[in-house]
A protein has these predicted regions:
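Short acidic-glycine-tyrosine-enriched beta hairpin
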Residues: 83-103
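Short solvent-exposed loop/turn micro-motifs enriched in small/polar/acidic residues
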Residues: 33-35, 61-63, 92, 100-102
Length: 123
């Protein structure tokens, strides 16, 4: 996969219009619906990966990496789960929100339509 904003170039792209190829989320990570997701890699900054991630139509689980993200469009309900799978707390994010995720956090994302975010994450 090529980077949309490789190092050494002064360039800009539209975060809303950038092509993100979507594929089905694995059955093991799907809780409800028929979610699809994808990533468009933008590049790397100081060893951290930067990209656009999109999720559509469903509920999925994930184990997070250290990450900071900005929601470009859409929104999600993110439930933070204990080791036993009980909801510890919930965060709602919408376009314009900035959020930090801590490595190892277990989450459940519910997306009615879509969420598209720009992320900076440990590689």
């Amino acid at each position: 996969m090529s980077e949309l904003l490789p190092a050494g170039n002064n360039a800009a792209i539209s975060g809303h219009a950038a092509a993100v190829e979507l594929a089905a989320v694995s059955a093991a990570d799907t809780v409800a619906g028929t979610p699809v997701q994808g990533i468009a890699e933008l590049g790397e900054i100081a060893g951290a990966g930067v990209g656009i991630w999109e999720l559509r139509g469903g509920t999925v689980t994930d184990t997070e990496v250290e990450e900071l993200f900005v929601v470009l469009s859409g929104g999600a309900t993110i439930e933070f789960l204990t080791e036993s799978g009980v909801v510890d707390h919930t965060v709602e994010v919408v376009a314009g929100d900035v959020m930090r995720l801590t490595a190892g956090s277990r989450t459940r994302w519910t997306v009615a339509d879509h969420i598209r975010k720009v992320y900076i994450a440990e590689a």
